[in-house]
């Protein structure tokens, strides 16, 4: 019996090595799941920057404005713009001698 390959059983019980029975539905399902897992893992490693950038930044598109009146939307835009404009004067100019 080899410990590193597959489990072998005595031939006299007519079990043999059951790893070669590829017609078993469980073996077929496990093979398909294994192949799909390998493909998804390879795609994840190849495109992980694109995938995780999409989930990190792509789904954050600001607060929902559904059901909010247009006047309140305009007020919110003005507040956001005034906050951006106020930050423009906070830059420090450093001159080296």
Swiss-Prot record:
<keyword id="KW-0813">Transport</keyword>
<keyword id="KW-0812">Transmembrane</keyword>
<keyword id="KW-0597">Phosphoprotein</keyword>
<keyword id="KW-1182">Viral ion channel</keyword>
<feature type="modified residue" description="Phosphoserine; by host">
    <location>
        <position position="93"/>
    </location>
</feature>
<keyword id="KW-0735">Signal-anchor</keyword>
<dbReference type="GO" id="GO:0020002">
    <property type="term" value="C:host cell plasma membrane"/>
</dbReference>
<dbReference type="GO" id="GO:0015078">
    <property type="term" value="F:proton transmembrane transporter activity"/>
</dbReference>
<dbReference type="GO" id="GO:0044694">
    <property type="term" value="P:symbiont genome entry into host cell via pore formation in plasma membrane"/>
</dbReference>
<feature type="glycosylation site" description="N-linked (GlcNAc...) asparagine; by host">
    <location>
        <position position="20"/>
    </location>
</feature>
<feature type="topological domain" description="Virion surface">
    <location>
        <begin position="1"/>
        <end position="22"/>
    </location>
</feature>
<keyword id="KW-0564">Palmitate</keyword>
<keyword id="KW-0406">Ion transport</keyword>
<feature type="lipid moiety-binding region" description="S-palmitoyl cysteine; by host">
    <location>
        <position position="50"/>
    </location>
</feature>
<keyword id="KW-0407">Ion channel</keyword>
<keyword id="KW-1032">Host cell membrane</keyword>
<dbReference type="GO" id="GO:0016020">
    <property type="term" value="C:membrane"/>
</dbReference>
<comment type="subunit">
    <text>Homotetramer; composed of two disulfide-linked dimers held together by non-covalent interactions. May interact with matrix protein 1.</text>
</comment>
<keyword id="KW-0472">Membrane</keyword>
<dbReference type="GO" id="GO:0055036">
    <property type="term" value="C:virion membrane"/>
</dbReference>
<feature type="modified residue" description="Phosphoserine; by host">
    <location>
        <position position="82"/>
    </location>
</feature>
<keyword id="KW-1133">Transmembrane helix</keyword>
<feature type="modified residue" description="Phosphoserine; by host">
    <location>
        <position position="64"/>
    </location>
</feature>
<dbReference type="Pfam" id="PF00599">
    <property type="entry name" value="Flu_M2"/>
</dbReference>
<comment type="similarity">
    <text>Belongs to the influenza viruses matrix protein M2 family.</text>
</comment>
<dbReference type="GO" id="GO:0140321">
    <property type="term" value="P:symbiont-mediated suppression of host autophagy"/>
</dbReference>
<keyword id="KW-0946">Virion</keyword>
<keyword id="KW-0375">Hydrogen ion transport</keyword>
<keyword id="KW-1083">Inhibition of host autophagy by virus</keyword>
<dbReference type="GO" id="GO:0051259">
    <property type="term" value="P:protein complex oligomerization"/>
</dbReference>
<feature type="topological domain" description="Intravirion">
    <location>
        <begin position="44"/>
        <end position="97"/>
    </location>
</feature>
<protein>
    <recommendedName>
        <fullName>Matrix protein 2</fullName>
    </recommendedName>
</protein>
<dbReference type="GO" id="GO:0005216">
    <property type="term" value="F:monoatomic ion channel activity"/>
</dbReference>
<keyword id="KW-1043">Host membrane</keyword>
<comment type="function">
    <text>Forms a proton-selective ion channel that is necessary for the efficient release of the viral genome during virus entry. After attaching to the cell surface, the virion enters the cell by endocytosis. Acidification of the endosome triggers M2 ion channel activity.</text>
</comment>
<keyword id="KW-0325">Glycoprotein</keyword>
<dbReference type="InterPro" id="IPR002089">
    <property type="entry name" value="Flu_M2"/>
</dbReference>
<feature type="transmembrane region" description="Helical; Signal-anchor for type III membrane protein">
    <location>
        <begin position="23"/>
        <end position="43"/>
    </location>
</feature>
<keyword id="KW-0945">Host-virus interaction</keyword>
<keyword id="KW-1015">Disulfide bond</keyword>
<feature type="region of interest" description="Disordered">
    <location>
        <begin position="59"/>
        <end position="88"/>
    </location>
</feature>
<keyword id="KW-0449">Lipoprotein</keyword>
